[in-house]
């Protein structure tokens, strides 16, 4: 096992990365190794998808499968070795379909790729786990050096994040052949184990550029299906009655669940990154979508244990449900998996509803605590003139974008301290589950109108923040980096990595990121990123605030 993709990975004087029988996330060495094997088969699939495109051959199912299976290797998504092995087998089935299709127009085709003809050494998990060891991601680390190896992983993990967003968009009927061709290009290239540092840095930015198009596609899918988000009040306290909790990112699953539970006397609560659902007109119209429960994903073992109903995980982040003894009432969907947990293959939520009716539910209604969500792209852009007026009037001095992933490191209290310590003439635009560090605090308003805390949505809704910045830049006639706007990113896993690469690709400079640096990037690479892009780590809220304000004077 060698896994170094998330913040909680092992960091020791002897080296970084989880490399024992189990990772810090709870993933076994077997599952981790099988994920490496799956990635190798996906490299092969992408190599042949590119070859097929030379003959205008596209197998839609193969294109859709590739990023979906890659998504399964993200942190806290799928811990089920059997399903990971199944994805690897399916990858080669699609790969072979592509080879057959190419062979019909180009007899005996061949491509120059080290994984072009990879085959699996068996069908059992045990056989494949033995084979998987040769595809560990650190096999040539010493040969190419820590810097190049780290930036290669930056590309791989960034592409994982983009793959996740591609899958989120796909379930909302958004699919672009050109974007998938780009994805296959990057995935195939990574399978050649590139080692040139300059090329790797260029590709990292190119992956970020591709992801901007992916986020636009996802934004279109969400707004076309559910309407443009509007500001809405959300109760974060329990309501008496039977209940279901839904977590993850898949708003389509939530819509299906709401339709199937309507009139059954079951209250539905959002959790984690599902919170923004309360701002979408086609979701908030359901009266039994009563509120949001819990906080960041890292607290789920305690919070799910005391939630008296059924739970649905539609995407990341999942952690061991056996710790809180709720494995019998949690269900996984899509690419999520945990051994022994019931997996729903389609949108039939009957087992979830049945389990919810068996559970006790909340015995009484607690005193309401309301927070506001729904500041999506259209709402933010519509408010851009008002924002400019406040800036010109000297009533709004700076906008801080504080968002990204949450996690359990004590250092993450930095984000709470920073947000709450900001002057009253500043606003905080937040997104991702990092918002749970401060979204239940009262920030008040600016000039009696604009809320100081603006919840833009899920981590992929960085697109909304970017489009606001672009709009302000155009209306003020200044560059993006001249705006009184700063980004303080909270990273934990691969979606945050691709968000960062997207910002850098767009030319956004002086981003602050923390609470710690990724373990796969050494000090030399971090210094290089600081030199090229102004990327900085965190110090203290007071010191970083001072640096930010001084740069904008």
Swiss-Prot record:
One of its GO terms (cellular component) is cytoplasm. The keyword DNA-binding does not apply. It catalyses: A + NH4(+) + H2O = hydroxylamine + AH2 + H(+). Keywords: 2Fe-2S, Cytoplasm, Iron, Iron-sulfur, Metal-binding, Oxidoreductase. GO terms for molecular function: 2 iron, 2 sulfur cluster binding; hydroxylamine reductase activity; metal ion binding; peroxidase activity. InterPro entries: HCP/CODH (IPR004137), Hydroxylam_reduct (IPR010048), Prismane-like_a/b-sand (IPR016099), Prismane-like_sf (IPR011254), Prismane_a-bundle (IPR016100). Its cofactor is [2Fe-2S] cluster; hybrid [4Fe-2O-2S] cluster. Hybrid [4Fe-2O-2S] cluster binds at residues 249, 273, 317, 405, 433, 459, 493, 495. Catalyzes the reduction of hydroxylamine to form NH(3) and H(2)O. Belongs to the HCP family. This is Hydroxylamine reductase.
């Amino acid at each position: 096992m060698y896994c170094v993709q998330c913040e909680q990975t092992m960091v020791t004087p002897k080296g970084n990365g989880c490399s024992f029988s189990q990772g810090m996330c709870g993933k076994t060495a077997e599952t981790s190794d099988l994920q490496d094997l799956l990635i190798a088969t996906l490299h092969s699939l992408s190599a042949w998808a590119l070859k097929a495109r030379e003959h205008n051959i596209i197998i839609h199912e193969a294109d859709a499968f590739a990023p979906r299976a890659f998504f399964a290797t993200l942190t806290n998504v799928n811990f089920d070795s059997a399903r990971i092995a199944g994805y690897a087998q399916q990858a080669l089935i699609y790969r072979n379909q592509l080879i057959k299709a190419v062979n019909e127009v180009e007899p005996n085709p061949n491509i120059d790729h080290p994984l072009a003809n990879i085959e699996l050494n068996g069908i059992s998990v045990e056989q494949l786990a033995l084979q998987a060891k040769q595809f560990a991601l650190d096999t040539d680390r010493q040969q190419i050096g820590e810097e190049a190896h780290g930036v290669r992983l930056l590309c791989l993990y960034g592409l994982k994040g983009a793959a996740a967003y591609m899958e989120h968009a796909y379930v909302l009927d958004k699919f672009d052949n050109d974007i998938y061709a780009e994805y296959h290009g990057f995935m195939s290239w990574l399978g050649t184990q590139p080692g040139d540092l300059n090329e790797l840095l260029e590709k990292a930015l190119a992956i970020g550029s591709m992801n901007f198009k992916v986020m636009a596609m996802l934004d279109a899918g969400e707004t076309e299906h559910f309407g443009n988000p509007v500001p809405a009040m959300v109760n974060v306290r329990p309501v008496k009655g039977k209940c279901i909790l839904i977590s993850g990112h898949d708003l389509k699953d939530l819509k299906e669940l709401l339709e199937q539970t309507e009139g059954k006397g079951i209250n539905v609560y959002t959790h984690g990154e599902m919170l923004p659902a309360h701002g979408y007109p086609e979701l908030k119209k359901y009266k039994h979508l009563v509120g949001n429960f819990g906080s960041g994903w890292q607290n789920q073992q305690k919070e799910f244990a005391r939630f008296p109903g059924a739970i649905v995980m539609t995407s990341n982040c999942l952690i061991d449900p056996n710790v809180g003894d709720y494995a019998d009432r949690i269900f996984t969907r899509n690419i999520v998996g945990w051994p022994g947990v019931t997996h729903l293959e389609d949108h039939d939520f009957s087992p979830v509803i049945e389990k919810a009716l068996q559970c006790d539910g909340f015995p009484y209604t607690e005193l309401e605590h309301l927070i506001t969500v729904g500041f999506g792209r259209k709402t933010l852009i519509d408010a851009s003139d008002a924002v400019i007026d406040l800036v010109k009037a000297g009533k709004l001095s700076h906008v801080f974008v504080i968002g990204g992933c949450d996690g359990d490191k004590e250092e993450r209290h930095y984000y709470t301290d920073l947000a709450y310590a900001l002057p009253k003439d500043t606003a905080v635009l937040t997104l991702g589950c990092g918002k749970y560090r401060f979204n239940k605090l009262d920030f008040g308003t600016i000039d009696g109108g604009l809320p100081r805390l603006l919840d833009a949505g899920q981590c992929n809704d960085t697109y909304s923040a970017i489009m606001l910045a672009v709009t302000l830049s155009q209306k003020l006639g200044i560059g993006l980096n001249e705006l009184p706007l700063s980004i303080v990113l909270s990273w934990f896993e691969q979606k945050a990595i691709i968000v960062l690469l997207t910002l850098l690709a767009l030319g956004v400079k002086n981003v602050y990121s923390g609470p710690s640096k990724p373990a796969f990037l050494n000090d030399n690479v971090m210094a290089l990123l600081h030199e090229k892009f102004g990327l900085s780590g965190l110090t203290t809220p007071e010191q970083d605030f001072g640096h930010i304000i001084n740069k904008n004077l």
